[in-house]
Amino acid sequence: MRILNDQIPQKDAGRQFGAAPVLLLCFFLYLAASCFILDATRFRAEKPHAETMRLAAEQTARCFAVLKDERLRRGYEIIPTDDPNLTGMVGYDFTEITTSHGSLEAKRSTTNPNTAAMITDLLVQCGVKEGDLVAVNLSSSFPCLNVATLCALDALGAEGVIINSVGASTYGANLPGFVYLDMEQTLLSEGLIRNHSFAFSMGGDYDIGYGMPDQDLVKTIEDRIRGYGLQFLHYKDIDENLAARLELYLGKAGNKDSRNSPVSASDFRCLVNAGGNILAFGGGEGLISAKSGILRPGRKPEEGKGLIPWFLNQGVPVIHLLNMNSLLPENGLPFDPIPLPDPGTGDVYFEMRYRKELVLLLSAGALLLLALTALRFPRRHPIQKGLL
């Protein structure tokens, strides 16, 4: 009579097959419950660099106060219906150097000094620390963001390589006798900022002030800013303009680099772009479709001209500051607040954290359950042939 020895392992395997699916189901239920517990037990805590963020916000508030006084001294009244918080940092609806339409609510939102805390946080997320090089492209449409960026760089001890364009959209820095670079000079004279612009263009169409109705006024502004010692950029061709700017960025960065060695794009920790001047995306549609916040380099090359695609294609992240109605709430700041929050306050300084001890405990439980599940799965047995 022939003995089939493989029948006994098959009986054991049946019992194992019955237990394994149950354990596997328990494992996945445990994971789902763990995720729920971890999410339910998160707690609110200050960000590790909250004090640096507060330093930037408080300095920005001091800058705004000085600029308000200087604006009034120069004869530009504040319109309460446009600037209900009476910050003095909201321009007029239209002037001789207004380049395009802008959102009044967005401009008002940036008068909150805590925007500097947000920018500091974004810089930290890009890895910026003391002594790092940061390329900066500023329009004059959001003067508050510009000042906040300078204060954020100062608070971190970073080195900004900064170029500004003078033209501004509605309610931006569009006061002909008090443009953004006049604001910078005021702050420099008061010793309130360390980082500042070293070059400028007129902005607007073709980035040369084309379309501004009073070209004599444009020339007056140009001459005034040249008197501050800033280098002037004037290129109608976008490719020439971009090449000249990149040469300036890399050349100026080389002067700031303590190693005194050639500088490449990778030596910049990030690019900050505030506003929507033509050099951001080379006048393409990317300016409209790109999300605000941190843009990370992708696997595929970015299409189009402009500083943002160029830096991304060099592997350098970009902090894009433009669409305030989404960017501010995403970072814990209110949109168009009345009254303004005090500097150093708000959700922007906090983050939600998981409880480490609970994470470790639940992870250990998951590993144990996974091990038990693996043990209950049947192993393959060699086929045993019985003999008579």
Which functions belong to the PLM regions below?
Residues M1-G14, L388:
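N-terminal Lys/Arg-rich, disordered targeting/topogenic segments
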Residues A20-D39, G365-L369:
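Hydrophobic membrane-insertion alpha-helices, especially the h-region
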Residues L31-K47, T373-R380:
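Membrane-interface motif at the C-terminal end of an N-terminal transmembrane signal
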Residues T52-N112:
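N-terminal, Lys/Arg-enriched amphipathic/low-complexity engagement segments
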Residues N114, D121-C126, E130-V179:
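Membrane-embedded segments
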Residues S140-C144, G167-Y171, G204-D207, N277-A280, ...:
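Solvent-exposed loop/turn segments at secondary-structure junctions
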Residues F178-D267, L271:
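A substrate-binding/cap region within the structured catalytic cores of diverse enzymes
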Residues A265-S266, C270, N277, G284-L388:
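C-terminal functional extensions of proteins
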